[in-house]
Regions:
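Short secondary-structure transition hinges
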Residues: 86, 112-153, 198-200
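Conserved hydrophobic residue
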Residues: 43-44, 136, 165
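Amphipathic, non-transmembrane alpha-helical scaffold segments
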Residues: 23, 31, 77, 137, ...
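Amphipathic alpha-helical linker/stalk segments
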Residues: 76-118, 122, 157
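A conserved beta-strand->loop->alpha-helix hinge within the catalytic CA
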Residues: 50, 97-102, 169, 202
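C-terminal peripheral helix-coil segments that are non-catalytic and often amphipathic
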Residues: 1-17, 101, 105, 109, ...
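Basic, helix-initiating cap at the start of DNA-binding domains
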Residues: 1-41, 45-57, 64-71, 97
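Hydrophobic/aromatic residues within well-ordered alpha-helical segments
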Residues: 26, 69, 80-84, 99, ...
Length: 249
């Protein structure tokens, strides 16, 4: 085999390998582009050709992977949120510590992994457009809301079983936890994006404050005492003053 033919074969193999790698990466690139546009513009205003253009492919290529804009949206939700529930359930199962600690950990972890990311804009999108797209709202309820509530219900039940939490109306106590987190998302993707920099709403301080308020309502007296001790800043060690004995002053 001549050298030129060997070089040509190697070039073709490299080109094929590069094309295959590009093909494998394409669904992820489309999902990233779709997430960006859905959060920026909303579901109704985002056009399939815009997603394709941002991902650097044709509209026909987009529909090879995702047959409709609705299926594309569902894939975005699964990739960024609902696909993580298995991982979160595993973390729940092995968590060591009190349920008060677990509640604080879950709220802060949720913010770091979802709330602080672009994916949190999906929640705002659903809240804004659910009435116009009931099928997508039902999908989000099934894929995100229901499993999320199931994990919170398990956490609250854990607290009641251990005696840390008082007897709760579980179905409604869940909303005491989700409501402040939903507010934080809505603020981030609405007024928070418009107000001057330095607006006094630090997400981590807000979550710590909400967790403390929640625990005051959820905990039994003994559980609240332990939670307060855990959260209270450590006082400086007391110093002891030794007075001289009489006659030795």
């Amino acid at each position: 085999m001549s050298l030129s033919k060997l070089v040509s074969i190697k070039h073709d193999e490299a080109h094929t390998f590069k094309r295959e790698r590009r093909k494998e990466a394409r669904p992820g690139e489309l999902l990233d582009a779709a997430l960006d546009l859905f959060v920026e513009k909303g579901f109704a205003a985002t056009r399939a050709e815009e997603v394709a253009a941002r991902a650097g492919v044709s509209k026909g290529t987009l529909f090879l992977y995702f047959p409709s804009k609705e299926e594309l949206f569902k894939a975005v939700v699964r990739e960024n949120i609902s696909g993580r529930f298995t991982e979160w359930a595993q973390e729940f199962a092995v968590f060591q510590g009190s349920t008060s600690d677990m509640l604080r950990h879950c709220m802060m972890t949720w913010w770091q992994r979802v709330g602080a990311t672009k994916a949190s804009g999906i929640t705002k999108l659903i809240m804004s457009e659910a009435r116009n797209f009931p099928e997508l709202a039902a999908f989000y309820q099934q894929e995100v809301v229901a499993p999320g509530h199931a994990l919170i219900r398990r956490m609250l039940q854990r607290g009641m079983d251990s005696g840390e939490f008082r007897v709760l109306d579980l179905e409604y106590a869940i909303f005491s936890i989700t409501a402040p987190m939903t507010f934080l998302i809505m603020m981030k993707h609405s007024m928070g994006a418009c107000v001057p920099q330095g607006y006094p709403l630090d997400p981590e301080r807000y979550i710590q404050s909400q967790a403390n308020n929640l625990l005051h309502g959820l905990c039994t007296r003994e559980g609240a005492r332990k939670a307060e001790q855990k959260d209270a800043p450590k006082a400086p060690a007391a110093t002891r003053t030794v007075l001289p004995a009489k006659g030795k002053q």
